[in-house]
Amino acid sequence: MSKLGKKPILIPSGVQINIEGDMISVKGPKGTLSQRLSPYIKVAIEENKLWVQQNEESIVRRSQRKMLRTFQGTYWSLIKNMITGVTEGFEKQLEIVGVGYRAQLQGNKVSLQLGYTHPIVLEPPVGVSVEVPAPNVVVVKGIDKQKVGQFAAEVRSWRKVNVYSGKGVKYRNEVVKLKEGKKA
């Protein structure tokens, strides 16, 4: 059994969990998320606790036990993130550092000027919202942790931080260790 799989997930009030076949859906105050479950996993709900268990019936060989433990921990984390997403939501903050580098909103799209000859216009996926509180700060919010992280990584990938000058797009809490330049 995985370390996480031994612990139950507490279901907060205001959250409804529905399990139909191989699909689990979590509904909360911020929205609804659903996830397909592996045939190697069983999900059981007791009162306000959710247990992620290995499906012993799906084992054909003994070598599959290790794989089942990894699935159990992975699905435990996925379901926990779904519950956190529909109750609190997720947020990633990006900082833009550099002269002339800035961001602005155009409707629901974000326009980035990162030193290229043209502005980069990115449209967030469904369920993800973007805010630009300052020209050098981009805030990505949503209920799906995977989509929020993926879109933030996509924004960052257009101009990663230069390790010599420190210019580029970085996460708010990211520490960039600057390298020393060439000495003559």
Curated annotation (Swiss-Prot):
GO cellular component terms, A-Z = cytosolic large ribosomal subunit
Highest taxon of the source? Bacteria
* Cross-referenced SUPFAM superfamilies: Ribosomal protein L6 (SSF56053)
Keyword Transport appears in the UniProt entry? no
Q: Which UniProt keywords apply?
A: Ribonucleoprotein, Ribosomal protein, RNA-binding, rRNA-binding
GO MF annotations in UniProt: rRNA binding; structural constituent of ribosome
Q: Does the keyword Protein biosynthesis apply?
A: no
Q: Which residues cross the membrane?
A: none
Can you cite a GO biological process for this protein? cytoplasmic translation
Task: Summarize the protein's role.
Answer: This protein binds to the 23S rRNA, and is important in its secondary structure. It is located near the subunit interface in the base of the L7/L12 stalk, and near the tRNA binding site of the peptidyltransferase center.
Q: What subunit structure does UniProt give?
A: Part of the 50S ribosomal subunit.
Q: Into which family does the record put it?
A: Belongs to the universal ribosomal protein uL6 family.
Family matches, as PANTHER family: 60S/50S RIBOSOMAL PROTEIN L6/L9, LARGE RIBOSOMAL SUBUNIT PROTEIN UL6M
User: Could you tell me what this protein is called?
Assistant: Large ribosomal subunit protein uL6
Species the sequence originates in: Pseudothermotoga lettingae (strain ATCC BAA-301 / DSM 14385 / NBRC 107922 / TMO) (Thermotoga lettingae)
